């Protein structure tokens, strides 16, 4: 589903190969019509793939009999070496573009042309020219994340503890944004709120930061819902029943007992939602304006201009942030083995170096706003 709905990759390196998201975007921008028809076709195909996958998953289930567990067999050194070579080879090929991206960000540039030597000038230009985009990449997804956590916690509780036809419908509808391409969702938001809700003039939010916040919240809600549902399913209802039998209200039980116990699932889903919010382009490219553009939009526009140094610097910053948040998510869910002291200290140093420009940028932005006032 992620590959089907991806916009940035085929748009930048797809050349003559157009995918559904790219086709929908070009049709919408050119105003020749047809984008709605292509959007409906994309939704039908995505929904069909999702239903087929769900049918196969429900039909075929596998379990292991504890009475006859699988016995491990010794593998020859040649097979072990082949497995390691294959796995690490795939990882190296996957990471190689990122390594070259970091290398490109430190190349010395003269205008838009790379020259001999190395320099951090691309990063200076990125912070000077794209400071607002970097600030928006934190500010807008952070507000959206608060909404995602609130709605995901509430919906997951209804889906697990209050199961009925209505809550099942809400749970199913909350997964729709996951299968819908981002360009389709962006066009839907523009069509719905360009002249207000149903053309009434109420909620004319197209071109504002609020429509970006809404789109990011709706688009990334399924990640946190599924993580929260999985966490809540591991909590016995008898714990809540015991609290209520001792005089605690349902709201108090939910706030002080249930929510803290499912906090690890909420945090894991929230960080995953955050990483996808700051790194996705498909919805933002349709809904942004000059004041609300994010780093992904800035990277896209810099690549189109041929300014690869600044684009590489912004991409490197975004990559480091994504790795940090993803690692924190794995640590919070207990999926990551504790690192040695030296590696842990190095990790703290990497976080400090990567986040320090962001905090200085926030102070700079606040100072500029105070001066304007």
Question: What is each model feature region?
Answer:
Residues 1-5, 85-98, 176, 180, ...:
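Transmembrane alpha-helices
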Residues 4, 10-47, 76-79, 108-132, ...:
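Interhelical loop and adjacent transmembrane-helix boundary motif
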Residues 36-77, 157-159, 229-240, 244, ...:
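C-terminal transmembrane helix and the adjacent membrane-cytosol boundary/short C-terminal tail
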Residues 41-56, 128-159, 166-169, 250:
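Transmembrane alpha-helix signature in integral membrane proteins
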Residues 80, 163-169, 211, 225, ...:
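Amphipathic cytosolic juxtamembrane alpha-helices at the membrane-cytosol interface
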């Amino acid at each position: 589903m992620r590959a089907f709905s991806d916009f940035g990759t085929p748009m930048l390196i797809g050349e003559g190969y157009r995918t559904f998201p790219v086709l929908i975007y070009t049709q919408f921008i050119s105003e020749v019509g047809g984008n709605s028809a292509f959007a409906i076709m994309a939704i039908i195909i995505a929904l069909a793939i999702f239903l087929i996958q769900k049918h196969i998953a429900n039909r075929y289930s596998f379990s292991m009999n504890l009475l006859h567990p699988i016995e491990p067999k010794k593998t020859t050194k040649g097979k072990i070496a082949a497995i390691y070579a294959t796995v690490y080879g795939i990882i190296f090929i996957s990471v190689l573009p990122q390594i070259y991206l970091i290398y490109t960000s430190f190349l010395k540039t003269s205008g838009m042309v790379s020259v001999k030597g190395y320099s951090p000038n691309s990063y200076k230009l990125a912070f000077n020219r794209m400071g607002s985009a970097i600030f928006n990449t934190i500010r807008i997804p952070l507000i959206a994340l608060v909404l995602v956590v609130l709605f995901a916690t509430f919906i997951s509780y209804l889906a697990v503890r209050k199961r009925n036809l209505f809550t099942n419908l809400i749970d199913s509808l909350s997964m729709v944004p996951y299968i819908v391409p981002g360009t389709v969702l962006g066009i839907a938001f523009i069509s719905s709120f360009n002249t207000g809700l149903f053309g009434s003039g109420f909620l004319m939010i197209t071109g504002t930061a609020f429509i970006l916040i809404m789109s990011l919240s709706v688009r990334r809600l399924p990640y946190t819902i599924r993580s929260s549902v999985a966490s809540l399913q591991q909590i016995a209802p008898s714990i809540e029943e015991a609290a209520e039998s001792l005089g605690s209200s349902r709201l108090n039980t939910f706030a002080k007992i249930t929510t803290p116990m499912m906090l690890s699932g909420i945090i894991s889903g929230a960080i995953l939602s955050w990483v996808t919010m700051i790194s996705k382009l498909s919805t933002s490219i349709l809904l942004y304006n000059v004041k609300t553009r994010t780093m992904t939009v800035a990277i896209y526009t810099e690549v189109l201009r041929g300014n690869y140094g600044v684009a590489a610097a912004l991409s490197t910053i975004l990559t480091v942030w994504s790795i940090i948040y993803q690692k924190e998510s794995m640590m919070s869910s207990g999926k990551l083995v504790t690192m040695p002291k030296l590696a842990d200290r190095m990790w703290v140093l990497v976080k400090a170096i990567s986040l320090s420009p962001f905090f200085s940028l926030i102070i700079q932005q606040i100072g500029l706003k105070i001066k304007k006032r």
